């Protein structure tokens, strides 16, 4: 028979935006559409939070001497605002984090005397710690973009075309009480972000490769693709090897060879947005001489790749030709009749979708929301560190105007390339208000290494208490959970199995209505009992239990489930 033991992991997190309670190790087996997450409130262009970092002298010195080499200890706290300075709510309790500077040597890297960009790692020094389910925060300094809205508009365009891409918000940053000004709080592309969009990350064969300057899917250049998620050793990157081989030998055609290992429909949509937005510093290039840069390659469980954008601060500046050569995948597509037709369809889709999206209003409204914070940045400018405010109000206004001119002209330029009539611009709309602080007093506290296995009654007013696992039982064909909830709603149970290096779906999603009047049993029917039997001595079973309440703010808990086989 199987005995069940629970190893409580370091972090238990409260959830405030997702109607979910996760029991056991694992992330949502979600469809391709991004699932909600407790950190979603941070990642809206209408959200402006305030972040306080504290660095001891030793950490400050290390960042001055070795800015990108390592994470140094610091503390982190964040507060929501109503979108304008002076409206911040209570800050979260400070937590220990790792901090390093961010940026490339020839790009946005700045020192602490300047407007530095930062990476914050929540589990750098506290094992298993997360904040709102996140392991990292990425704070871009926007020093390459005086308008401070290029990235927001670019990712909005990618998302409108169905290209998986990071969400963004803004944060006003202070370090040791000194102003570092407005930063773009951009969603870090890591396993957590991928699982929101694509479901459980099973490695191998899944990977996330980062494509920095010059890296491409050709022999000699594919080694420059950095493995950000997934197995890194030689022989464990078969997905990338298959893609490189297909590109090198496109027989009988590029589409026929590359299509099985690359989602060319998705990639052509990404390239269409790159060209539309003038992203000369991306994958598809501008002249044929520009090296690929600022992209990710994500391989799904079958080893098929999608391409994800990154580093879009150089968009909306100058138009680039729609068929200017770039990376080898883009070039190969243009040389293939079928793929080129797909790309032109993607361009036509970009013309219709992005014109209707009214990016001009998005840019105008974002710049209006940021203006009071830019004024605050200027007001808090330190005479000792003037470079922490790199742009004047006039430079910002000029950059915003140039961005809007680009957006206004681009539909006609693309229509001319496609040989169609230019679309009429959409009517201007009033700007929506900034995101307001939520009803409770502050964002929820992060997970910590000493939290109990259930959340205490310190939840915000009006929230739903976390579902409570009463008991669990493993049968020959199913896992049975009995759960108590504090309100009416629906339970949804997903599961998958990891046995050594083998992974498989454990069960089909199960749904049950639940209420506070009685506990509810929900069953995960195993789809592969043979894999379970092959485990012999132990088995790791990952279950995700969502609780979708009729009302209120739900919570989240996590733990590990280990099954051990005993005789007797």
Q: Where are the regions that the model predicts?
A:
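Bacterial N-terminal signal peptides that target proteins for export
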Residues: 2-19
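Polybasic, low-complexity, intrinsically disordered segments
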Residues: 34-35, 405, 416-417, 422-568
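Internal "kinase-insert"/substrate-recognition segments embedded within catalytic cores
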Residues: 117-127, 134, 138-143, 161-166, ...
């Amino acid at each position: 028979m199987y005995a069940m033991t629970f190893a409580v992991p370091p972090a238990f997190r409260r959830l405030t935006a997702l109607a979910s309670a996760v029991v056991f190790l694992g992330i949502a087996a979600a469809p391709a559409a991004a699932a909600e997450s407790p950190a979603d409130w941070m990642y809206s262009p209408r959200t402006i939070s305030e972040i306080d970092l504290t660095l001891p002298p030793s950490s400050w010195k290390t960042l001055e001497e070795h800015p990108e080499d390592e994470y140094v200890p610091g503390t982190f706290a964040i507060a929501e605002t109503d979108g304008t300075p002076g409206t911040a709510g209570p800050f979260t309790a400070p937590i220990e984090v790792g901090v390093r500077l961010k940026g490339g040597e020839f790009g946005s890297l700045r020192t602490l005397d300047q407007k530095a960009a930062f990476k914050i790692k929540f589990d750098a020094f506290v094992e298993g710690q997360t904040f709102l389910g996140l392991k990292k925060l990425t704070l871009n300094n926007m020093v390459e973009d005086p308008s401070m809205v290029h990235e927001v508009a670019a990712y909005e365009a990618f998302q409108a075309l169905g290209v998986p891409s990071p969400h963004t918000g803004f944060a006003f940053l202070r370090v040791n009480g000194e102003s570092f000004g407005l930063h773009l709080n951009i969603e870090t592309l890591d396993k957590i972000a991928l699982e929101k969009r694509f479901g459980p990350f099973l490695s191998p064969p899944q990977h996330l490769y980062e494509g920095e300057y010059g890296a491409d899917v050709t022999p000699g250049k594919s080694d420059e693709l950095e493995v950000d998620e997934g197995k890194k050793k030689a022989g464990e990157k078969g997905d990338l090897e298959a893609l490189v081989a297909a590109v090198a030998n496109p027989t009988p055609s590029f589409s026929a060879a590359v299509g099985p290992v690359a989602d060319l429909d998705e990639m052509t949509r990404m390239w269409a947005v790159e060209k539309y937005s003038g992203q000369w510093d991306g994958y598809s290039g501008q002249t044929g001489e520009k090296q690929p840069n600022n992209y990710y390659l994500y391989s799904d469980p079958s080893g098929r790749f999608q391409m994800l954008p990154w580093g879009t601060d150089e968009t909306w500046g100058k138009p680039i030709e729609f068929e200017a050569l770039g990376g080898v995948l883009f070039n190969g597509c243009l040389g293939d009749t079928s793929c080129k037709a797909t790309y032109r369809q993607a361009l036509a889709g970009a013309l219709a979708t992005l014109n209707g999206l009214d990016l001009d209003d998005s840019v105008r409204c974002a710049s209006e929301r940021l203006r009071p914070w830019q004024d605050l940045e200027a007001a808090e400018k330190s005479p000792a560190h003037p470079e922490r405010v790199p742009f004047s109000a006039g430079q910002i206004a000029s950059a915003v105007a140039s961005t809007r001119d680009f957006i206004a002209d681009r539909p006609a330029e693309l229509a001319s390339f496609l040989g169609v009539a230019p679309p009429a611009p959409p009517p201007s709309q009033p700007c929506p208000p900034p995101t307001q602080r939520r009803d409770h007093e502050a964002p929820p506290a992060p997970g910590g290494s000493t939290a109990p296995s259930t959340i205490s009654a310190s939840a915000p007013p009006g929230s739903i208490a976390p579902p409570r696992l009463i008991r669990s039982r493993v049968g020959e064909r199913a896992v049975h959970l009995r759960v108590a909830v504090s309100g009416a709603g629906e339970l949804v149970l997903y599961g998958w199995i990891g046995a050594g290096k083998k992974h498989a779906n454990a069960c089909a999603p199960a749904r049950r209505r639940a209420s506070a009047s009685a506990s509810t049993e929900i069953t995960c029917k195993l789809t592969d009992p043979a894999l379970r039997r092959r485990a012999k001595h132990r088995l790791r079973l990952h279950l995700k239990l969502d609780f979708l309440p009729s009302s209120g703010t739900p919570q989240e808990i996590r733990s590990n489930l280990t099954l051990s086989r005993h005789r007797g």
